[in-house]
């Protein structure tokens, strides 16, 4: 088994990013649309199609012995976001290690000391960008989607470089099946590319593709069963297969706006490094360049910029964050390409480039990322409950209010009210 390069990078990124995420995690609901998922996680309401991964994340967050239900759900999302950042850093480090000169070249271990700085800088630039930070510290499935994607990318990298083993193929098949079973963003981003790799490896005469479909189907069925079984309500085929195709692809105008938001959050330096890295990957690893290029474009087609809110956007809320995380991979390759041209100054250049790549995403949004309004949903719920008469039947009117009222019922507020189920 190949030795892992820079093993200290993974725990350092996880702990460091987790501290930052915890510092920005709100202690309550920061948006009304999250109330529906929190209520559904305890069986108070039926899950919507495409929200099953959110239910699994919220049930995981409910295990935290800190704060109320919403705060625990936010903390669970923060842990998964930190895991995604650590996996992304490991992916960038492995990619840079794959681009090293041959073993007989006149270079020693000291000539590669700049790699962990570039990998950590790219991972933090993606993980601490505004969209990733906001979605990763709030209740929902976005952080789990990012962790799922990062794990699948890490498993796919050796296969893309024609150096994969059976364990990499099995991991990719299992994660793709899990994504297709529960996630309408990670599913369309993974299983088409995984299917292409499966055909390619099968044509090369590898044996693991013969067993991969069984693992894919088992992961798809198991994840779907785990997410819908606690609800106790019958589900149709559209609900079960919601993760196999996109929840909705928007038009070209929304795509341009989302792409502009992507470049704005990465910053000028990050965007230039990502472009340079894409050219370098096209020359040295075209399959890797195609994989992440497809991921970025498809994620932009599925996602929306952070200004969009509401229950309608919950299923594809991780689209823009997934594009930001995927763009961090060519960013690390571009920074390494630029630093390598400076000879002995590459160590200093790597530190400077990593710092410049992180500064713009971290400063984006100013203090708003640390001061999330958790009073709006609470005041709306309090106002709705105060206006309701005793022992009344309440018609929520909208899906957002339905989730908010059922969230209040989970907390034990106004048990005398009967909430009319929306059809």
What are these regions (language model features)?
Residues 66-90, 108-112, 116, 120, ...:
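Loop-to-helix entry region of an early transmembrane alpha helix in multi-pass inner-membrane enzymes
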Residues 112-113, 136, 149-171, 178-179, ...:
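Membrane-interface transmembrane helices that cradle and orient dolichyl/undecaprenyl
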Residues 188-218:
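Perimembrane helix-loop-helix junctions
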Residues 282, 333-363:
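Signature aromatic-anchored transmembrane alpha helix within multi-pass, membrane-resident enzymes
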